[in-house]
Amino acid sequence: MDSRAALHHVTLSLAGRVVLHDVTFAPVAGELVALCGPNGAGKTTLLRALAGLLPGCDRPDPRRVAYVPQGARSAWGLTVAQIVALGRIPHADAAQAPVERAMETCGIASLRDARVDRISGGEARRAMLARAFATEPDVLLLDEPTADLDPAAAHDVMRLLRRTAENGRAVVAVSHAIELAIQYAHRVVVLAGGRILADLPADRALPAAATAFGMRAGADPAPRLLPR
């Protein structure tokens, strides 16, 4: 079991179909990396491979690497604090300080006693992120963390992820929203057909992303950018 997540020249087949082609990728501390590309590009597959959840992929230390799948919602009868405390399971302890820090970081400390099924979608997403933060990982792997959120909530989540990276963690997030990726990520990795087409600083990633999505390269991808 490796302590961190990394892929080195990985080719992966599932159900007889090659889903990753010679992929090399490693998260970097201090960076928010957005994985972008059209449906079926291999974004979630790459993320799950990093998390060691696919056959033949090394499983990183769960105390060091936290994975949040798309739409992660579990144990809805629990309170926010109880959900976040589940993040301590990999450490086999019930330490409360990391739980409190995670709720403060994610801006949900005031909701600690609220049931997760009775708060907004954005607040519930923050509770799932806080559960991952409570693990105190070095690497955060997030599949579509802004999916189904309204624009303001999506920007809030991306700001939080960028701050988290700039505080020294490695953060990797799958995103269909090119505008959010370009505005908040430090790097954008563009995938298509299970291959990495480009790995670029965010402010240089639009042409490659446009190619992958079949967009017109000069199109404005970000009509609703908000201040960071």
Where are these predicted regions, by residue range?
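Conserved ABC ATPase signature
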Residues: 115-119, 123
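Catalytic Walker B motif of ABC-type/P-loop ATPase nucleotide-binding domains
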Residues: 140-143
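Conserved ABC ATPase "signature" region
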Residues: 96-111
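ABC ATPase nucleotide-binding domains
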Residues: 210-228
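H-loop/switch region of ABC-family ATPase nucleotide-binding domains
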Residues: 175-176
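The feature captures the beta-strand-to-loop junction immediately N-terminal to the Walker
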Residues: 36-38
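Helix-to-loop junction immediately C-terminal to a conserved catalytic motif
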Residues: 51
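ABC ATPase C-loop
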Residues: 132-133
